[in-house]
Amino acid sequence: MVVIRAGSAADAAQIAEVQRDSWFGAYAGIIADEIIDRVTAVDGGARVRQSFRTRPWQRMIVAVPDGEDGGIVGYAAFGPETDVLGAPWPHPLSTDGEERRVAELYALYVRPPWWSTGTGRALMDRVLARSVAAGYSSVTLWVLRDNRRARRFYERAGFAPDGATNVLTGLGDVRELRYRQQL
């Protein structure tokens, strides 16, 4: 059982550790270990602290074990849908002329020992509830095409591929798929 709370810059080092552990667990055989090591070896805590300063639209939540003094075991980052540079899109108009607000799940990572414990689902439920409360009509996310475990998780949470794809050249030319859920 975990407690979900707002993340803060004070959590940056632990959030970066969760990301590193998750990448090595989830992306083994998809992204080369040397690439994961290179990408996550930089001072992740500083990178996360910077995102709190430079991405004011981003919301971060963390999962901590209930009743334990343990550290952060998972986190999610979300906010308005972003462009390829990570800046929020202006709110595009839907086909009927009404403003369409789209949220994006930027990241959801859980330490491997906490996989299949309900931690990821608790984070996802909070992201979806907060997106509804903020007035978003749908949520998107990007997932590596070959990350079958994550794709099953997102599909069980109500997401489906919407046809958009992207190639991450800096990570060894891996393909990612965009998933979407109407709220």
Where are these regions (language model features)?
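Hydrophobic pocket/interface hotspot
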Residues: 15, 19
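C-terminal "cap" of GNAT-fold acetyltransferases
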Residues: 91, 102-103, 137-140, 144-183
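Conserved SAM-binding loop
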Residues: 4, 116, 143
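Conserved N-terminal entry element of GNAT/NAT acetyltransferase domains
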Residues: 1-13, 177, 183
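A residue-level detector for conformationally permissive "hinge/kink" positions
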Residues: 14, 110-112, 155
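Acetyl-CoA-dependent GNAT
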Residues: 6-9, 20-115, 121-126, 130, ...
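Enrichment for repetitive, rod-forming helical segments
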Residues: 12, 26-27, 156-158
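Charged catalytic carboxylate motif
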Residues: 14, 122-123, 149
